[in-house]
Amino acid sequence: MDDDQRRIPKFYDLSVEERVRAVHERGIVTLDDFRSLATGKHTLALEAADKMVENVVGVMGLPLGLGMNLVVNKKRYVIPMAVEEPSVIAALGSGSKLISEHRGVEASSTDPIM
């Protein structure tokens, strides 16, 4: 599936269930991820959290949203973001739309120097 076929117009207007289905149908998430997201139960178990970081005392949930259609080096990306501020993902979406209308951005890096 090429980048244009992976686009999901008006993604923000879809219900949560429709968004999960749409990203799976376009190959953005795996079948296992789709099944996990479709359950609506995403709480990290305390036992798992304790193995991930030191001094665990609890788990805090944040909404997981997707920044859609960021074009970098002529490839379209979907950016997962766990944030509590609604305008962050909306701003990424607006910026991505403007950028993609002008062929996206190009990124490069230098060889490591250390």
How should each PLM-predicted stretch be described?
Residues 84, 88-108:
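Mobile "lid/hinge" segments at catalytic clefts and subdomain interfaces of large enzymes
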Residues 111-114:
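Flexible hinge/switch segments at interdomain interfaces of large molecular machines
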Residues 1-77, 81, 85:
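Acidic/polar, glycine-rich intrinsically disordered N-terminal extensions of enzymes
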